[in-house]
Amino acid sequence: MSKTAFPRGIIVVLCVTAGFNPVAHAETAAPIFGDATIQHPLSSDPLILRGMSGGAIPGSKIAGKAETLPTGPCKGFMDEAPDHTVKLTSKFDYLKLVVQSPADTTMIVKGPGGTWCNDDFDGKNPGIVGEWLPGTYQIWIGSYKENESLPYTLKITEGK
């Protein structure tokens, strides 16, 4: 073995290792279908969660009703399991959840005090605002076409 063969091998291994660092890549993008535990005041406002909408279950079946007052109709198709679980460690006098997506989406939230549905809070984007009790909330994001998946961000903010 020549004197130069060993150092070249180390250099190649170091270059390959430096080019592939899954930890660094994982930190740059927010996880899809992430859950959150938050307290008042929010430490990061807005808090952003990402996901893919849709599924095969009608929103009215997830919600157990066709509409919730005053937030709106329980439309769209969703997965059986919630897309996100958000735990509030304290009461929020005002909290806003708004979905942003390139296409029309729907939302269902189940938690302390009931179930809320929404379709077109901000244009074609669903959202729910108001007073929120401490506890665990399950959140579903739906699509109008069965089994259609659409990328979205869920923004959680105390800002009006």
Which residues make up each language-model segment?
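Bacterial N-terminal signal peptides that target proteins for export
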Residues: 1-11
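Bacterial N-terminal signal peptides
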Residues: 9-19
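Sec/Tat signal peptide C-region and signal peptidase I cleavage site
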Residues: 20-26
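Intrinsically disordered, low-complexity, charge-dense segments enriched in Lys/Arg
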Residues: 27-30, 156-160
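Predominantly extracellular/luminal regions of secreted and cell-surface proteins
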Residues: 27-66
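Non-catalytic, beta-strand-enriched accessory regions in extracellular/secretory proteins
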Residues: 65-94
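Hydrophobic beta-strand segments within beta-rich accessory/binding domains
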Residues: 84-101, 107, 137-141
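Noncatalytic accessory or regulatory domains flanking protease catalytic cores in secreted, cell-surface
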Residues: 108-155
